[in-house]
């Protein structure tokens, strides 16, 4: 009888242990899961660089990593881009640099063509989203330059996706900006209305 009691106690402890063990690793794994779409996107970005809007073919691939909201914003900005060229058929004005000289996921000017990336850290926000900090590198091997962006990742339909990119302030960039905001500059939904509209920034 004593042996049976010991066996029963052992089985009970074992079952309770199995029931509790997965909870802690699950919390640990969430930041790692949040990094997956970020690594996927930037791996493609450095292997085949994007300037301005991705082609429809490339956008289809990149959409795997993006939230439905960000995809919608990019599509509206592309429609606004087309509307701008419709309004300027003679091409007598320079198109907004956000469309032509800007890396949507990396930054403007000499930050548009990163050649390498490294995920540095991941932080959770109170709303359940994550910020994945990525260091990007561009320039010649003997003298490259680095900068950092914060990629906002959220859960959507059971998977993590990128919802925004924050271009962080540093010694070369005076103000912080967001991709979601830059996509709306000068636009009213899919129509170009100029920099004087409520969505525009100086």
Could you tell me what each predicted segment is?
Residues 11-19:
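Hydrophobic h-region of N-terminal signal peptides that target proteins for export
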Residues 119-121, 148-155:
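Hydrophobic/aromatic beta-strand elements that line small-molecule binding cavities or substrate pockets
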Residues 20-25:
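Bacterial Sec signal peptide processing site at the extreme N-terminus
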Residues 67, 71-144:
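Surface-exposed, charged secondary-structure patches
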Residues 1-7:
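Bacterial N-terminal signal peptides that target proteins for export
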Residues 126-148, 156, 161-202:
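Low-complexity, intrinsically disordered terminal/linker segments enriched in charged
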Residues 26-97:
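Core segments of small alpha/beta cavity-forming domains
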């Amino acid at each position: 009888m004593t042996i049976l009691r010991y066996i029963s106690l052992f089985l009970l402890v074992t079952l309770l242990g199995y029931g509790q063990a997965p909870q802690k690793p699950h919390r640990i794994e969430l930041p790692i899961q949040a990094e997956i779409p970020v690594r996927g996107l930037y791996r493609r970005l450095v292997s085949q660089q994007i300037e301005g809007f991705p082609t429809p073919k490339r956008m289809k691939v990149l959409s795997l990593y993006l939230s439905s909201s960000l995809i919608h914003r990019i599509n509206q900005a592309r429609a606004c881009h087309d509307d701008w060229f419709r309004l300027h058929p003679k091409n007598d004005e320079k198109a907004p640099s956000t469309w032509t000289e800007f890396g949507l996921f990396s930054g403007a000017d000499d930050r548009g063509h990163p050649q390498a990336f490294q995920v540095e850290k991941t932080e959770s926000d109170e709303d359940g989203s994550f910020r994945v900090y990525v260091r990007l590198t561009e320039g010649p091997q003997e003298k490259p330059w680095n900068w950092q962006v914060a990629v906002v990742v959220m859960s959507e339909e059971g998977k993590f996706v990128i919802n925004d990119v924050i271009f962080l302030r540093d010694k070369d960039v005076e103000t912080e900006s967001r991709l979601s905001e830059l996509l709306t500059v000068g636009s009213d939904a899919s129509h170009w209305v100029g920099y004087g509209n409520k969505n525009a920034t100086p």
